[in-house]
Amino acid sequence: FIQANDMRPLADTANFIAVYPQGAIDPEGGTTSWIHKAPTDHDDIFFIEAIINELSTEYDIDQGRIYACGYSEGAIISYELGCRLNSRIAAFAAVSGSMLDDYYRDDIYGWGTCSPVHPTAMMLIPGTVDQNPHSTYEGLSYGDMPLYMSANDITTFWSSYNNTDAVPVITNVEDVSPNDGSTVERKVWLNGDNCSSVQELKVIGGDHDWPGVLGNMDIDATNEIWNFVSRFSIEGKLNCNISVNDFSFDKKQNLNSNTKDKY
């Protein structure tokens, strides 16, 4: 992940701590993929919580501004952190990876349903032609068993939980790279509890990529994510004067921050 998306230069200027964990080693086989088989007692959520606790003893971290993001399987674990470590996660983002359906999470893994405990801002950046089983735009089922949620189901879940406006504000991102074979539609659900919001950057024609590095070049996923999550704490939006323009990244804007956050 760090090879494709090195956030350290941004962390240096925006004053946050970038942490790149590797999935805990599975005692049965030695692999390090995130939550890759079920049923299992091998639970990466406990591992991430232990990392947060350990880093909190070494650094002066704002405990109200701990964020998560990930790509592919890392996106899946980001959703799980939003669901099952929600009391520690202020906001999160997922790129090219889907959210486990509650059937898969509960009946197969035995982790219970997704149960956040506070209004939680979240962003997803899916590609509409992504054919990886765990990240297809339309979701994935095996027979009558739902496994991974569609992008629409994900935004419905989080916008409903956050009690946002039912209808999103939709804008088209400028197609500054017409040769990349894709465009981006920005959908923002505003006015949630504690001024929370949900945002989808729908990459139309996008594949299993991290925009700005591979695939779509109209947006930079790294900057888009930080611009979004950094506006929230565990208690909600830092400034409740919400405008949809708040969520449109401008490369000219100042990303410097006076707080040290874990990301």
Language-model regions: role of each:
Residues 75-86, 96:
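Short glycine-enriched nucleophile-adjacent loop
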Residues 217-239:
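Catalytic active-site module of serine/aspartate enzymes centered on a nucleophile-bearing elbow/loop
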Residues 9-14, 60-62, 69, 73, ...:
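Extracellular/periplasmic catalytic domains that process cell-envelope and extracellular macromolecules
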Residues 22, 69, 95-96, 123-127, ...:
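Alpha/beta-hydrolase-fold catalytic nucleophile elbow
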Residues 90-91, 96-182, 188-195:
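The feature captures the conserved acid-bearing segment of alpha/beta-hydrolase catalytic domains
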Residues 205-209:
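Histidine-bearing beta->alpha loop at or near hydrolase active sites
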Residues 165-168, 236-262:
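Residue-level detector of functionally pivotal "anchor" positions at catalytic/ligand-binding pockets or at interdomain
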Residues 1-67, 71, 80, 84, ...:
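Serine-hydrolase catalytic machinery in alpha/beta-hydrolase-like enzymes
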